[in-house]
Amino acid sequence: YYSYDGYTFYTDQAMNTYAGTYYNYYQFLPFRTKSNLSASDLQNYLNNVGHGNDSVMSGNAQAFIDAQNKYGVNALMVYAMACHESAHGTSYYATTRANLFGWNAVDSNPDQASSYNGIYSAVEHHMGENLNGYLDIDDGRHFGMAVGNKGNGFNVCYASDTYWGIRIASIAYSIDKLAGLKDLNK
């Protein structure tokens, strides 16, 4: 199948023969929802992808659950975002600055990436402060409550990668699938 927007699909490369429409659940899941996954489920995913021993995220999954309960932001989606943005907690900025989300690591000068005192601090800051602009309808960065795509959601302003939202959604699905689909369509 072929698609120009990630949800309208065609059977031919010229995109003349319509096949159907599909919306990825995790790509459009509002961040103001609560995940049913536990810290163990998140850690199991990290172990399963081979980063249980070399990731700064390892042993810190509870930070995402605690911040979800404190700020009302979906722990699964933020964990998936951290996995994508930090190469599962193994990137240079993750390991040297506890920056799991690429804050201030702009394309033109990634070395201005923010530093945090630790993973809990980074997660707290991300879920409690940084995402607020994307979730606040009065903020200029607000284009929807989900990771979305370049048409709506965080992906409009958060990342230059056109497929950023679907990449995070794919990781979220993989995490949830390994945990027994505790969140899908709930």
Language-model features: where?
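C-type cytochrome heme c attachment motif
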Residues: 80
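Catalytic cores of secreted/periplasmic lytic hydrolases that degrade extracellular macromolecules
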Residues: 1-77, 88-186
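Pyridoxal 5′-phosphate
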Residues: 85
